[in-house]
Amino acid sequence: MKYSILGLTALSFVASAAAHTLVWGVWVNGVDQGDGRNIYIRSPPNNNPVKNLTSPDMTCNVDNRVVPKSVPVNAGDTLTFEWYHNTRDDDIIASSHHGPIAVYIAPAASNGQGNVWVKLFEDAYNVTNSTWAVDRLITAHGQHSVVVPHVAPGDYLFRAEIIALHEADSLYSQNPIRGAQFYISCAQITINSSDDSTPLPAGVPFPGAYTDSTPGIQFNIYTTPATSYVAPPPSVWSGALGGSIAQVGDASLE
């Protein structure tokens, strides 16, 4: 059977659009905090990825605007992000969208501007079970967690990021049809108590931290061994308390 190039392009667009993802909300110590979209999540108008590394959308996605609420936590709590596609019970993201996951923190007063983003968590390719972070996110029903660090009490932005590499064989700046896809979501979080707090160090800017020459931005997952992949810097902060990709709760049981 023969297919026209136009038809294949259309099919590719439809498949791509059906694969996009956003953060629905968060859980704290296994307790669902409810639908956070435009409430405590700075939600973009749709689930399209960001691809332009120089765009201000690299900060907290499109329309980085303050939303009315913030989720209260304490240092040492487990904060879990829950991603979704269109509805909470559908596929999280296409299985073809292999890539890493990271979580950053910044003071909310900065609105994410400047050298303020500090990496708390990173997971890319697991050589033990030969899976990408996104593969395990799908298995975990869209949930991954980070432990709230011991920083000064106050308001913060937690920036969850997925980098989908299925079209990262080319750079967006050279071929806008392709390029790595960034799924970004910022949650407004208030840390109420923290013993022995450690000041956040200087961080990196978004946009600015990633460039065309940054490791992990251009990578051909089809021809290059996944074991050679290096996630984009910066490295995880020494004061970070870790995280994981695992399901902590089942929304269908609520």
UniProtKB/Swiss-Prot annotation:
Q: Which GO terms describe its biological process?
A: cellulose catabolic process
* Residues at which Cu(2+) binds: 20, 97, 183
> What does the UniProt record note about how this protein's activity is regulated?
The polyphenol cinnamtannin B1 contained in methanolic extract of Cinnamomum cassia (cinnamon) acts as an inhibitor of catalytic activity.
List of residues that carry Methylhistidine: 20
Q: Pfam family example for this protein?
A: AA9
Quote the biotech use from the record.
Lignocellulose is the most abundant polymeric composite on Earth and is a recalcitrant but promising renewable substrate for industrial biotechnology applications. Together with cellobiose dehydrogenases (CDHs) an enzymatic system capable of oxidative cellulose cleavage is formed, which increases the efficiency of cellulases and put LPMOs at focus of biofuel research.
Q: Which residues, if any, are the signal sequence?
A: 1-19
Binding locations of (1,4-beta-D-glucosyl)n: 28, 66-67, 77, 86, 148, 159
Q: Which reaction does it catalyse?
A: [(1->4)-beta-D-glucosyl]n+m + reduced acceptor + O2 = 4-dehydro-beta-D-glucosyl-[(1->4)-beta-D-glucosyl]n-1 + [(1->4)-beta-D-glucosyl]m + acceptor + H2O
**What cofactor does this chain's UniProt record say it requires?**
Cu(2+)
Describe the processing and modification events after translation: The catalytically essential N-terminal histidine His-20 is post-translationally modified by methylation to prevent protonation of the histidine side chain, and protect the critical active site of the enzyme from oxidative damage.
Q: Which GO terms describe its molecular function?
A: metal ion binding; monooxygenase activity
Tell me yes or no: is Ribosomal protein among this UniProt entry's keywords. no
Matches recorded under InterPro entries: AA9, AA9_LPMO
Kindly list every residue the record annotates as glycosylated.
52, 129
Q: Which PANTHER family match?
A: ENDO-BETA-1,4-GLUCANASE D, PUTATIVE (AFU_ORTHOLOGUE AFUA_1G12560)-RELATED
Q: What does this protein do?
A: Lytic polysaccharide monooxygenase (LPMO) that depolymerizes crystalline and amorphous polysaccharides via the oxidation of scissile alpha- or beta-(1-4)-glycosidic bonds, yielding C1 or C4 oxidation product. Catalysis by LPMOs requires the reduction of the active-site copper from Cu(II) to Cu(I) by a reducing agent and H(2)O(2) or O(2) as a cosubstrate. Is able to cleave phosphoric acid swollen cellulose (PASC) in the presence of a reducing agent, yielding a range of cellooligosaccharides dominated by cellobiose and cellotriose.
Q: Which family does it belong to?
A: Belongs to the polysaccharide monooxygenase AA9 family.
Its protein name is AA9 family lytic polysaccharide monooxygenase A
